[in-house]
Amino acid sequence: MWLMDNRKLINDFLDNYWLSVGVSQNTLNAYRSDLIIFDNYLKQNTDKDFKSLSKINIENYFNKRVNIDMSMSTQARIMSCFRKFFQYLLDENYIKENPIVNFKLPKKDKKLPVHLNEQEVTNLLEAPDISTTIGLRDKAMLELLYSCGLRVTELINIKLNQVNVYNEFIMVSGKGNKERMLPLSNSAMETLQKYEKEVRPNLLNQGKTNAYFLSNRGKAMSRQNFWYIIKRYANNIGINKPLSPHTLRHAFATHLVQRGADLRAVQLLLGHSDISTTQIYTYIHNTILKSQHEKHHPRG
């Protein structure tokens, strides 16, 4: 009964949230996972269900989650999910008080994202064998990802009508369906021209899809497939850093800041709604400068 009741509340909340806000499927999947994991934790560690929680139960949960090295961004997402979920329970009269009101996340040191230096990025972009159909496709995807600092979801969701390889710009749809126009680097533009002319028609064969990047079977490329592609090439060239699907996006922003780009311009290119999100790349830049100073200064 407990499990069914809690899972029904989760499903009802997600249905309501989707209908009222219209968020992406990725966000809904993440929220569902966050709430199910929390539900399992409650079942294993307490005698509480969602309707009888106190603030201390949530504090204990977050303290335990922090101890398993959860990233700040993941913590923030879970907190956002919990705030919306418990407000929904309050609005629907399932609970009388919101246990998460005025709750603050446990403090944790800021963790800078892993980034690749310019030579490592060059090596990664040159790893695909462009004499092959698949290699040229992979090269085009990697070039575009780094050229524009795209999120992987933005990359794989690009449609044919969003790319004009002769206009030197692409249109992408980011979080909240916000569109932004992004300039293409010369190398990305040249590779995309070859991909459109020589590769995509072969991958499409007799199929029909307006997805720009296609899998080996002529279907739209998936996040999982592209993540596998990145890891495979990184392993092939000996990059041993812990990578993520956002690694080239981080490299894009870090290298722009290192070369003197205005932070607000970087914010617009990345599609960040708040410049405080972009400021992490100034910290990375300063960390690199400090490391170089300590390494090369005679009294460092």
Segments from the language model and where they lie:
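Conserved catalytic core of the tyrosine transesterase superfamily
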Residues: 1-300
